[in-house]
Design a protein with these regions (language model features):
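Catalytic-core region of carbohydrate-active enzymes that cleave or remodel glycosidic bonds
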Residues: 1-13, 40
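Catalytic domains of carbohydrate-active enzymes that cleave complex glycans
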Residues: 7, 34-195, 416-424, 431
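Structural recognition of the beta-strand scaffold that forms the well-ordered cores
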Residues: 11-14, 208-210
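Active-site-proximal loop/turn and secondary-structure-junction residues that shape catalytic pockets
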Residues: 17-20, 320
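Histidine/acidic-residue-rich catalytic or RNA/ligand-binding cores of hydrolases
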Residues: 22-32
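Beta-strand-rich recognition/accessory modules
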Residues: 193-205, 212-214, 222-233, 272-282, ...
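Short edge-strand/loop segments of extracellular domains
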Residues: 223-228, 319-336
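Hydrophobic/aromatic beta-strand elements that line small-molecule binding cavities or substrate pockets
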Residues: 288-292, 302
Length: 434
């Protein structure tokens, strides 16, 4: 604020938590400090923080101040902290195990130091953010046998129920800005359950498919490296685990998804290296998708059929979200359809470590593109028949996770009754090109 005043700024819009239930992290402290600085931009911020904490937490102020400082150390450059971004998930790197352990210890000290129930309740409310981070981390899904599920599903459900009950006691209506807590509870009840998986495996890859999760492939495990080529979605994300992986989506055009959902089932007759899925679209179209392992490659063949009595405009998109490791060493390589060679550097100094691009016509890849980590490891390779592809999309982020997403869209066509649209794509590993 002092900088703004020096440059002649006469007014500022200061935004705090807007949910009617209140309860946002440090909302009272933030409002107090902002109000004081609006009156006097030269006020000592640390003194203001101490004033508020001592008045609000009494004898528990000292451990609460220690928690305040611990949180800030996670992102201060001089303390080896990480950059903080808007909409960071609970899995953000600055909310690591060491930080959580320190926070738990300080909140225990604060609760013990509280001189009465009113102060103890304030400490308990302040701890809800840490409780939520730990709760979402416990929600992480893994494959065990034929199931994709959290490790302790029953315990997780009990913890979630208790957490929601505490929110209600404090009158808190929002966990995050985008949705109300009641909707988050609905999503938890809907999505957090076991999902049966089908597994394909050869001597190079192991692939897990979850038909009930949009027919998506959740894992393509490179057995030589012992790692999943796909970026695993963050458990704090909305609608988790129905996110990410490798999936195909029907569109009415290149922007608008077809209305409703597609219900997928695993077809009979799967083998150890091949399986097929059938998807029933809500508008009556049908998708047939075959997945087959061939050495270091997962080959996919997808057919969208108009099974309705009327013409339907349709397109398909096949996308995989990859995790190639540290994006500062990652490039995307491909040859354009006009013959030009491209090596796209994803992370550049002094620029936001995220972005997206769309390619069509002569600019799009000529049937193959690769994600290469220059620090080592196999290339992540996607191939497709260029005559089937109308557009390609690339997006990446290194904010709170390392993720590179590559999507191929089919031609958009008006399908007459009984007509079909095909999109093939292969995904796997290869040797890095010089």
């Amino acid at each position: 604020m002092a900088m703004y005043k020096r440059h002649g700024v006469a007014g500022l819009f200061m935004e705090g938590a807007v949910s009617k239930g209140g309860g946002a992290e440090n909302a009272g402290l933030r409002s107090y400090v902002m109000a004081k600085l609006l009156w006097d931009v030269q006020a000592d911020v640390n003194k203001l923080v101490d004033e508020f904490l001592e008045a609000y937490y009494g004898q528990a102020a000292k451990p609460m101040r220690a928690y305040f400082d611990l949180m800030h150390r996670q992102v201060r450059p001089g303390d080896g902290g990480r950059h903080i971004w808007i909409y960071d998930p609970p899995s953000a790197p600055y909310l690591g195990d060491e930080f959580l352990a320190g926070a738990r210890a300080l909140f225990r000290q604060a609760e013990q130091a509280a001189e009465n129930d009113a102060v103890r309740a304030r400490v308990r409310q302040a701890r809800l953010g840490i409780d939520y981070v730990e709760l979402t981390r416990a929600k992480r899904f893994t494959v065990a046998g034929e199931w994709y599920r959290p490790a302790d599903l029953d315990g997780l459900k009990d913890r979630w129920s208790s957490f929601m009950s505490v929110l209600g006691q404090f009158g808190i209506t929002n966990i995050s800005e985008s949705t109300v807590a009641a909707r988050d509870d609905e999503d938890f009840q809907r999505y957090v359950r076991p999902y049966r998986v089908a597994t394909l495996e050869n001597n190079q890859l192991r692939v897990h498919i979850a038909p009930e999760l949009g027919g998506r492939v959740t894992h393509i495990i490179d057995k030589r490296a012992g790692r999943n080529l796909l970026a695993e979605p963050q458990p704090g994300a909305k609608q988790y685990p129905d996110l990410g992986g490798l999936r195909v989506t029907p569109y009415t055009d290149y922007v608008t998804r077809m209305p409703g959902t597609t219900t997928w089932t695993l077809d009979p007759g799967a083998t150890s290296t091949q399986a097929s899925l059938t998807g029933a679209c809500q508008n009556g179209l049908r998708i047939r998708r075959t997945l087959r392992l061939d050495g270091p490659t997962l080959r996919t063949e997808t057919v969208l059929e108009n099974t309705t009595p009327a013409p339907v405009t349709a397109a398909m998109q096949s996308q995989w979200d990859t995790d190639p490791g540290d994006l500062t060493a990652v490039v995307v390589q491909y040859r354009r359809q006009d013959g030009g060679a491209v090596e796209k550097v994803l992370i550049e100094p002094e620029k936001i470590p995220a972005g997206s691009e769309s390619y069509s016509g002569a600019e799009q890849p000529d049937g193959e593109w690769r994600v290469i980590n220059r620090s080592g490891g196999p290339a992540l390779v996607s191939r497709f028949p260029k005559e089937q592809a109308a557009r390609c999309y690339l997006s990446w982020t290194a904010k709170s996770e390392n993720r590179v997403a590559m999507a191929v869209s089919s031609l958009s066509r008006v399908l007459q009754p009984g007509e079909r649209l095909t999109l093939d794509a292969d995904y796997g590993t290869g040797e890095p090109q010089p």
